[in-house]
Amino acid sequence: MSADILVVYKKNFEAVHDRAMDQIQSALEKLVETRGIRTEFTAREKVRHSDFIGRDLVIVVGGDGTLTSIAHNVGADTPVMGVNSHPRRDDPTGSFGFFMGSDPENFANDVVLALDGGAIDNDLPRLQAEIVTTSGNRIKCDPALNDLLVSNTHQYQPSHYRLQRDSDGMNGDIDAVQHSSGCLFSTFVGQGAWYRNICEMEGQTFPPSEIDSNYLFVSRELDGEQRRPGEYMAWTAEPTVITSDMHRGYVVSDGWDETHFIRGATITISMNGPRLHLLTFRERIIDKLSHWLES
């Protein structure tokens, strides 16, 4: 059976991006002729969850932001291939492309590896937030590859909430009322996106055996006297439960999708999100972060 491929691209008016799309489309047209694959192209702004159902491969063209936003629609059964359309290697104004395993120059060879099972399959965990409303409805927020923010929708106002977490072996049971700038949660692979920019973590490393089950937590700009272990920062596998005392709050997944809640809602954050099968071709994602792993 021929492969069914969805290509999602970042829509802009940059010539470098247009050239990348031309190279990608040309390579795929050859595979349509030689292998009989089926392809569909759609802009990020037009894509729907239903577009991803039944696909054998999803190709995301753009940068890390494009990939993390699109990955929210992809379940655990569909491999994703990222193509950096404007690599920083070629232009200092380009994209770093941390999650992007391919580029226009290597795409023709890489996509064949992906179809033939020769790519590196990075099986990555994702954060999941579940909101229970005051009327008992349950809302699952989009899974986050990098990070989740839970805060007041008005960033100039403090976030008021109750924070709870069971003992995790490092910290005892947590049950605290806090006023902060919101709570940030990060996966191990996502900590470089935002978390390390607001936390002092110089030299901190993590056990390799815990990176699939644990996540990072911080209460942003928490008062100094409240910065107790586990309440201010944590590296934990236990779910965190937040009970809102805010008129309006929201969960933001990877800086993209927002899910709103009101006072009295509970938000449970854990590593129970669907895993993401991200394909790379020259190195594993985890190899890029070896300096943050205990040896």
List each model region and its residues.
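Short glycine-rich anion-binding loops that position phosphate/pyrophosphate groups of nucleotides
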Residues: 63-66, 86, 188-192
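N-terminal glycine-/serine-/threonine-rich phosphate-binding loop
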Residues: 1-79, 114-119
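Catalytic core of DAGKc-family lipid kinases
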Residues: 86-183
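Short, solvent-exposed amphipathic alpha-helical segments in soluble enzyme
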Residues: 22-24, 74-76, 199-204, 231-234, ...
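ATP/nucleoside-binding phosphotransfer catalytic cores, i.e., glycine-rich phosphate-binding loops
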Residues: 150, 167-170, 226-295
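Solvent-exposed alpha-helices and their adjacent loops that cap or buttress functional pockets
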Residues: 50-53, 72-75, 119-122, 137-142, ...
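Gly/Ser/Thr-rich active-site loops/lids in small-molecule metabolic enzymes
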Residues: 173-225
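Beta-strand-loop-alpha-helix segment that lines the small-molecule cofactor/substrate pocket
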Residues: 77-89
